[in-house]
Design a protein with these regions (language model features):
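A short beta-loop-alpha structural element at the N-terminal edge
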Residues: 4-16
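Acetyl-CoA-dependent GNAT
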Residues: 34-93, 104-105, 164-165
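Conserved G/P- and acidic residue-centered "switch" motifs that form tight phosphate/ATP-binding loops
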Residues: 12, 98, 127
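Conserved GNAT acetyl-CoA-binding A-motif
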Residues: 111-123
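Conserved catalytic-core motifs of GNAT/GCN5-like acyltransferases
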Residues: 70-73, 120-123, 135, 140-157, ...
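Conserved acetyl-CoA-binding loop-helix of GNAT-fold acetyltransferases
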Residues: 96-109, 132-136
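Acidic/histidine-enriched, glycine/proline-rich intrinsically disordered or flexible terminal extensions
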Residues: 167-177
Length: 177
């Protein structure tokens, strides 16, 4: 089977919602406990589009989304405007097929193309597979916060990793850039 990574379109939102809701219900990849409806995903899609941020999907030969990736603002303050936090989710039937790393690699290139300087990953501390993938793609661990989250009745540690997208670049000199 071959895979293609492309920009998401509204027709992908049902598959994105299904993948997201599975992560909510069955994994520690996201610490939300409530599933979302299609309207929620549409609002999320529209907000990403309005900000000029990508949503990528990896699709099979039938053009069905098997995973998705996106990034958004790290924090809502001007001083962080060159730093983004990403998310990557893969359909449960497709995990272990290296789709996540492919999506993340494509997303990194998009962030570079957008002129971003740092990409942040916030990963559940016990997710060794995700931490390993991030290390393979050049991320370094920048911190660990013990017991800052809770899901499925357990305290969760948060590992922060970051990737310098354009090391050595000088900061923009114009105000507001």
């Amino acid at each position: 089977m071959s895979y293609v990574i492309r920009d998401a379109v509204p027709a992908d939102l049902p598959a994105i919602r299904e993948i997201y809701n599975d992560a909510v219900l069955n994994t520690l990849a996201i610490w939300n406990e409530q599933t979302v409806d299609l309207d929620n995903r549409q609002q999320w899609f529209d907000a990403r589009q309005a900000q000029g941020y990508p949503i990528l999907v990896i699709v099979d030969d039938a053009d069905v989304a098997l995973g998705y990736a996106s990034f958004g603002d790290w924090r809502p303050f001007e001083g962080f405007r060159h730093t983004v936090e990403h998310s990557v989710y893969v359909h449960p039937d497709q995990r272990g097929k290296k789709l996540g790393p492919k999506l993340l690699a494509a997303l990194i290139e998009r962030a570079r193309g957008c002129g971003k300087h740092v990409m942040v990953a916030a990963i559940e501390g016990g997710n060794a597979a995700s931490i390993h993938v991030h290390k393979q793609l050049g991320f370094v661990t920048s911190g660990r916060m013990p017991q800052v989250g809770i899901k499925f009745g357990n305290w969760l540690d948060l590992t922060f990793m970051q990737l310098m997208l354009n090391p050595g670049a000088l900061p923009p000199q114009e105000r507001g850039q």
